[in-house]
């Protein structure tokens, strides 16, 4: 189950409002704790293949179904995976290009979309 809004935004039964926030990788755990507390459940960062499944190459501005995930910034989102070829870098999925990149060190902030197992 996906969180409809990126971290920092709030679902108001019609759309995501507010501003999505970029987090450094070491700040993500705190956001997950807050989500678990406020929204109940066991939220987590998605694996690379999970986040890649949200990419919609036919979609316009943001490469994601905005009817399901409204107001998604067309930028990079963290996955939970380290780039095994370059262990200082994490994998991200870019919703502007629809591509996956393993070139972001954890100190560069990126957006976060959380998921939980049913």
Please place each PLM-identified region on the residue numbering.
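An exposed tryptophan-centered "aromatic clamp" motif
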Residues: 27-44, 48-97, 103, 117
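Extracellular, disulfide-bonded carbohydrate-recognition/adhesion ectodomains
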Residues: 19-25, 98-113
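Extracellular adhesion/carbohydrate-recognition regions
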Residues: 1-43, 114-115
